[in-house]
Amino acid sequence: MSQSVESRTRIKSERYESGVIPYAKMGYWDADYVIKETDILALFRITPQPGVDPIEASAAIAGESSTATWTVVWTDLLTACDLYRAKAYRVDPVPNVADQYFAYIAYDIDLFEEGSIANLTASIIGNVFGFKAVKALRLEDMRMPVAYLKTFQGPATGLIVERERMDKFGRPFLGATVKPKLGLSGKNYGRVVYEGLKGGLDFLKDDENINSQPFMRWRERFLYSMEGVNKASASAGEIKGHYLNVTAATMEDMYERAEFSKEVGSIICMIDLVIGYTAIQSMAIWARKHDMILHLHRAGNSTYSRQKNHGMNFRVICKWMRMAGVDHIHAGTVVGKLEGDPLMIKGFYNTLLESETDINLPQGLFFAQNWASLRKVVPVASGGIHAGQMHQLLDYLGDDVVLQFGGGTIGHPDGIQAGATANRVALESMVMARNEGRNYVAEGPQILRDAAKTCGPLQTALDLWKDISFNYTSTDTADFVETPTANI
């Protein structure tokens, strides 16, 4: 028996009247929404178009990143639409900025495929960033529920196992990127690796854009690099490594290169962020299976993470990459040549290293996060750093980091090995001073000068680079406090 007209009318309600109605009226705004433990939460910075109410703009973002389209569709009635609609539940004005708002949005966990960064991002950063109702949109932070995190592998190796494997404790790891990054022959490339490791570094590294070019094919680079690693390890009596970049055009090529890196004895391989989320997860699974450390270079991230009003904050990338399963990720230096506000970088490092984080608005952490026992990712600091900044680096970044001195090693006038030695002595003298209870931050320059009295390479480095720094105001700074961005 067919439904009566009266019954159909009751079911339709105002929400399902045909045509275009506001997103907030369609159910994508709910100021009284009670957050579930299993909800995925997102915090967007929105800049509505003139005349667009911020609540309606927030509801539109919630709708377009979950189930909505531009008009009412009756097929919503065939779904558990009240459950599957994302709900914007809170809108706050951004402090000290006109016409920008923080929009809090909750998503039911069943909107997302288990263990898939690609599926998560297809919704959260999909079509919404081109939506006309907002002039600009930025994803600032997310909270992943424990139930969702448990569907991800997490870091292939993790900080604790990496320290055990490297037999390095109580200090940062030391590394360097081979320079020039492009153009060297395989034999010369391998010699750079050897000299850096022989001088005292723990790691040498391929750069993001060295893959398999005419001047040096990948297999040649791998063989010569590992020859340098093995000779330096035997000479120093220490475990050392070189990040072999396996980034390639296809997954088949990447697996081939990764397999070869394992065959020739490497303990670590490397990929670039630009290969995409599915490829990153695939390589992390491979690395876990083959007992390899997996380094991720964040190549390309600043195209969408640097501008404050549009794109995506790097802390979100940190969260996704911890879920995806990388062991290292470049996360800023504070004092180097690349973008890096001190508080923002502290938030990045805490996201990668802590088992649980609380809300910390000065660091940009809008949600408390329990990491469900996923392993820790080692942050990497690289780009424009040198031995004379060692006290600042140790103060800002702590022990659980890889300090990579590329130009600060290879640019040493007495040679690569001397540059590496300068960095190793600078680090060990600073760690010793700290462990003795000295105020190593205030006394840092004097500690370095004292160490240089018995280390010629360090004295040369201090004379050459002195207090060189890159004092530019960061574009991505805290919204809730003023922070220094100069290298002081």
From Swiss-Prot:
Recorded name of the encoding gene: rbcL
Protein name per Swiss-Prot or TrEMBL: Ribulose bisphosphate carboxylase large chain
Cofactor(s) for this UniProt protein: Mg(2+)
Ligase is among the record's keywords: no
Residues annotated as catalytic: K179, H297
InterPro entries documented for this protein: RuBisCO, RuBisCo_large_chain_AS, RuBisCO_lsu_C, RuBisCO_lsu_C_sf, RuBisCO_lsu_fd_N, RuBisCO_lsu_N_sf, RuBisCO_lsuI
Organism, scientific name: Pyropia dentata
One record GO biological process: reductive pentose-phosphate cycle
Catalyzed chemical reaction(s): 2 (2R)-3-phosphoglycerate + 2 H(+) = D-ribulose 1,5-bisphosphate + CO2 + H2O; D-ribulose 1,5-bisphosphate + O2 = 2-phosphoglycolate + (2R)-3-phosphoglycerate + 2 H(+)
